[in-house]
Design a protein with these regions (language model features):
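Class I Rossmann-like S-adenosyl-L-methionine
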Residues: 1-159
Length: 159
């Protein structure tokens, strides 16, 4: 990384990486990250928390959505790249208040911040594939390929 994290997504990625590497509680890691970031708005703090806790909470769901989009086993994808894909997929699946285009764009932009230009096309392709597989609305009952998005709510995959 060239610069310290300044955006909600950069903070979330940094905290998720530290959480994965150290096993420390995400809450403490977030507070440390916020204390080191000047001028972050309340809204961006909230987004960083939502992204961090959401990816941790929904790892199994995110992995299940990502696996069919990638030809190689997850173990052969670099850990930071997989986490970046989880972050993008979380935004597509669970943050209805954010546009899908922005979620993909901002996630792909993280590759630049991470100095990983070679990940750019791969991340864009995988996240666009996830986007194509999402259905238009929510389902009332859980089909075999539905994604739980809340109590009694499911997002139907378009496959």
């Amino acid at each position: 990384m060239r610069t310290p994290p300044r955006t909600a997504r950069q903070i979330a990625f940094t905290v998720l990486r530290q959480w994965r590497e150290t096993g420390r509680f995400a809450a403490g890691l977030l507070e440390t990250a916020f204390s080191r970031t000047d001028g972050i708005s309340t809204a961006d703090r909230g987004l960083a928390c939502e992204l961090t806790y959401g990816v941790i909470r929904r790892q199994g769901t995110l992995d299940a959505v990502l696996r069919p989009q990638i030809k190689r086993p997850p173990e052969q994808v670099e850990a930071d790249l997989w986490m970046l894909l989880q972050l993008g997929a979380y935004q597509l699946l669970f943050l209805s208040s954010h546009s899908q285009h922005a979620a993909i764009h901002e996630t792909v932009e993280l590759t630049r911040w991470l100095n990983k230009a070679r990940w750019r096309g791969f991340a864009n392709g995988v996240l666009r594939s996830v986007q194509r597989d999402l259905g238009e609305g929510t389902a009332e009952t859980a089909a075999a390929d539905a994604i739980p998005t809340g109590p009694g709510r499911f997002l139907q995959l378009a496959r």
